[in-house]
UniProtKB/Swiss-Prot annotation:
It catalyses: N-succinyl-L-glutamate 5-semialdehyde + NAD(+) + H2O = N-succinyl-L-glutamate + NADH + 2 H(+). Its EC number is 1.2.1.71. One of its GO terms (molecular function) is succinylglutamate-semialdehyde dehydrogenase activity. Pfam families: Aldedh (PF00171). The gene is astD. The keyword Electron transport does not apply. Transmembrane segments: none annotated. This is N-succinylglutamate 5-semialdehyde dehydrogenase. It comes from the Bacteria. GO terms for biological process: arginine catabolic process to glutamate; arginine catabolic process to succinate. Catalyzes the NAD-dependent reduction of succinylglutamate semialdehyde into succinylglutamate. PROSITE patterns: ALDEHYDE_DEHYDR_CYS (PS00070), ALDEHYDE_DEHYDR_GLU (PS00687). NAD(+) binds at residues 220-225.
Length: 485
């Protein structure tokens, strides 16, 4: 039983899919995907459940969500273990994901009250009222890199606002979503309020094409996001929120301060989660000269000693595997392409078996036309620069705009950087992957269109209803011109 539809666990009727553990290629989950008809059933179940769910007082919806939060706390280690087995991320890291799920629930409850409150005031003898109403049935597309945390950041705000949900997780992490859906079931969620459909592209297309959805919250690749954007073009009746990737720049000033602290910040920016975070640094801008040379030498020395291993290794790894062997091969092929364009290897990314890839660093300064691509893995491109203005200009030369960062102890450099850089998340002397759950997450350009995550997700899960109210109809002292009564 791999799908949760209308409160029942059912088997799929489509093609067989399976989840392979990327660090040993063992099958950890398998089942049949949902057919178009089953997706339609899930959407219909959500539509039917919406009628009563939206009427339920907020306090009742909150109570169910908070029971779910307690279940996540109680099962945090088992959730983390499943995520580690499916993604290959170190166990210590997946434990933080389970904790983040709970933290985002508290943020979402606060956001509901602060972003979508009930307000009323008097104006010119009228009562002006602002209410918020749920959109209806929300489709949620989850990514593989944070298969618990990121869908949770859409599902919880949607439910709190009174929407119902159909979740389609990544086909590479179906097990995680199944485990989490069973916790929602234990929390006492009414039948049909959340529905889970598993599958690959055809299942996703069926859900995105379903007439019964009112909105779609997507986290994933730019390519898939752009397909959805074109598909929804002209359909003003549905809300589409896209969180996609980035070709994120990190600029290191000559005034970078402590050498090892800077190197640590770069490593955390580029190689955390084996480079599989959408905010990871992809391009590193380093000043020409001796200070830049020393920085790169130290960075290479530290990076080549990064411990890469299985999630549960006795010697705790910093990095795990890529999500799949195909993803690992993509990084190695990207390295070859950059070399062919004139890139010089400072540290070669190597295959370590199964889906493991060691971190790589390539000097792309002499690449005449650097591809504007997101290499979703542990491959860092270095570009040398002469002035901060040049570095910022190069950093902005991308169709993306998710995250960017400056390492500098000079306040005037930061003032210049934050004024001229184009990105939605901009950090100073902190890793690019650092983001607050109660701040907007996203950026302009090909990185997405809205910021439907964490605190600001409330904005996209309800629409404002403005009312001008009176106890009874009135006749004004002076009628409008041309009227007689």
């Amino acid at each position: 039983m791999t799908h949760w539809i209308a409160g029942d666990w059912v088997s799929g009727e489509g093609e067989m899919i399976q989840s392979l553990s990327p660090y040993n290629s063992e099958v950890v989950w398998k089942g049949e995907s949902a057919t178009e008809a089953q997706v339609e059933s899930a959407v219909n179940a959500a539509r039917n459940a919406f009628i009563e769910w939206k009427k339920l007082p907020f306090e009742n919806r909150q109570a169910i969500v908070e029971r779910f939060a307690e279940l996540v706390k109680d099962n945090a280690d088992s959730i983390a273990e499943v995520i580690a087995k499916e993604t290959g991320k170190p166990f210590w890291e997946t434990k933080t994901e389970a904790g983040a799920m709970v933290g985002k629930i508290a943020i979402s409850i606060r956001a509901y009250h602060e972003r979508t409150p009930y307000k009323e005031r008097e104006a010119a003898g009228n009562k002006i009222v602002l209410r918020h109403r749920p959109l209806g049935v929300m489709a949620v597309f989850g990514p593989y890199n944070f298969p618990g945390h990121l869908p949770n950041g859409h599902i919880v705000p949607a439910l709190l606002a009174g929407n119902t949900v159909v979740l389609k997780p990544s086909e590479q992490t179906p097990w995680t979503s199944e485990v989490i859906m069973k916790l929602w079931q234990k929390a006492g969620l009414p039948k049909g309020v959340i529905n889970l459909v598993q599958g690959a592209r055809s299942t996703g297309e069926a859900l995105a094409n379903a007439k019964g959805i009112d909105g779609l919250l997507f986290t994933g690749s730019a390519n898939t996001g752009h397909i959805l954007h074109r598909q929804f073009a002209g359909d003003t009746g549905k809300m589409l929120a896209l969180e996609m990737g980035g070709n994120n720049p990190m600029v290191i000033s000559k005034a970078f301060g402590d050498l090892d602290a800077t190197v640590y910040t770069i490593v955390q920016s580029a190689f955390i989660s084996a480079g599989q975070r959408c905010t990871c640094a992809r391009r590193l801008y380093v000043p020409e000269g001796e200070k830049g040379d020393a920085l790169l030498a130290r960075l290479v020395d530290v990076t080549k000693n990064i411990h890469v291993d299985q999630p549960f290794s006795e010697t705790t790894p910093f990095m795990g595997s890529q999500i799949s062997i195909a993803a690992a091969e993509f990084i190695l092929n990207a390295q070859k392409k950059l070399q062919a364009l004139g890139g010089e290897l400072l540290l070669e990314a190597r295959s370590l078996g199964h889906a493991f890839v060691s971190p790589g660093i390539i000097d792309a300064t002499n690449v005449a036309e650097l591809p504007d691509e997101e290499y979703f893995g542990p491959l860092l491109q270095v570009i040398r620069y002469t002035t901060l203005a040049q570095a910022v200009e190069l950093a902005n030369d991308t169709r993306y705009g998710l995250s960017a960062g400056l390492v500098s102890t000079d306040d005037s450099e930061w003032d210049y950087f934050v004024e001229h850089i184009r990105a939605g998340i901009v950090n100073r002397n902190r890793q690019l992957t650092g983001a607050s759950g109660d701040a907007p997450f996203g950026g302009p350009g090909a990185s997405g269109n809205l910021k439907p995550s964490a605190y600001y997700a409330a904005d996209y899960c309800a629409y404002p209803m403005a009312s001008m109210e009176g106890d009874a109809c009135e006749i004004p002292e002076q009628l409008s011109p041309g009227l007689t009564l």
